[in-house]
Amino acid sequence: MPELHLRVKSPCALLFFYTLLLAVDSTGVFRLSILCALLHECGHIMVFIALEHRLPALEASLAGLCLSMRGVLLSPGRELLLAAAGPAVNLLLAGTMLAWMDGPAGYSYFGLWFASTNLLVGGFNLLPVPGLDGWRIAGCLRQLVQYRLRCHSTYPYI
């Protein structure tokens, strides 16, 4: 059975930070944020397994949990799928929860916080900022557009 490789950066600081936040989180929002972040990463992991047929290496740090892409070369299209998988999971879960609450289940405190936190995690990760999924998505789209323009530039449109 394949093994999951997890690298923890600054384990003492990470443990202290999480322990402190969990101790003062009387509303449960931090626990819900951790759940939504883990679900986000599960989206990336599922697509990585589908593309590469192996488990990815993971890194945990104060910035969060992320896939380690060291030594993994993907085409821009495959990297686009991988980068979009995490936010897609969050947005899908938020939409599903809102649709479920709009039906027979009715609105609940947990449901609203779960949907809101998923929207926040998914939306935040779509920002085109270095280190986030949005940056990788924008880079992949740029590469795909440049490739498409390069391929069609040999044929004049006149």
Locate predicted features:
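Hydrophobic transmembrane alpha-helices and their immediate loop junctions
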Residues: 1-158
